[in-house]
Amino acid sequence: MNKKLIALGLSVLTAITLLTGCAGEKKEAAAPPVKDLKVTYVKSPLNIPSIVDKNNQTLVKEFGKDKISVTFPEINSGAKQTEALASGSLDVCSALGGTSAILAASNGVDVKVVGIYSRAPKAFNIIVKDPAIKTAADLKGKKVVGPKGTILHQILVAALNKEGLKPEAVNFVSLGIPAGVNALLNDDADAALVAGADVLRAQKAGARVLCNGEGLVDATIVIGVSGKLLKEHPEVVKKYLAIHQQNIDFMNKEQEKAFGFTAKETGLSLDEVKIMAPWYDFSTRITDKDIKDLEETQDFLLAMGMQKNKIDIKSLLAEVK
């Protein structure tokens, strides 16, 4: 009898312990559902898929089916995009320079690269007016203007390096692209770093392309997302990428319409859009070549003293499942 009572007592005690333990376990709270998705709208230098999306309202319509509203802050600066991402006022950097993504990650911003937006070495150019400047070697001692710490700046350094020159061989002045073109055309600079439609503008005014990124830099633009969004709602990121692919498919299948949208949005003529469009590869899959290009971009940033903390580039990339 006593043995039965003892056994019963132990059973009750075990049950109480188990129940208490279960009650004591804290379940991780589920992340709140996404109600508003903030995606940058960047049309330059010639971001045709984004322009298609704006005209067709693809993201708005598709996410609307899930009762998610989409807003489009127009932030062109890569640094400002990643600042907004860090502050939580942005979820997706739709078209972010590889330089900006790497710098942000090295400074602790929780950004993940989930795809490639474009590769366009032909779209990023060093332009000049002086007929005596025939190669990058002729830029020695000259004033070169353009945006610092960007793909364009990287192309300049790579072009100089190819000629056996260090970055210090030129007088580099940081200027935005439109201002740089104006400086060149007004003889306030010997060369300007120019991308997209501004290349055609400069050429029309008498400037010419000295060289572009071909054989130097792939000019990789990435799709960056908040690490928090990816961790808590991978399905939203997956859907975003699928919708982005819809825009690319539309561009490929309805080329005349896509080019028409782009001409209207950028102020270019239809013929000019047709000249520039082949410069761009909008395939989103991250390849080994892309990884190598991003690693070389990091080498550039470190060498120029613009990046202090080296990162593992592969840790910046994320596969969306």
Spans of model-derived segments:
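Ligand-binding cleft/hinge of the Venus flytrap
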Residues: 51-68, 153-172, 203-204, 260
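Secondary-structure end/capping motifs
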Residues: 232-306
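Pocket-flanking alpha-helical
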Residues: 47-53, 73-110, 122-136, 154, ...
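Short, low-complexity disordered leader/linker segments with a strong preference
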Residues: 1-36, 321
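Flexible hinge/capping segments at coil-to-helix
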Residues: 30-31, 128-143, 231-235
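A local structural motif
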Residues: 32-37, 62-74, 89-91, 162-174, ...
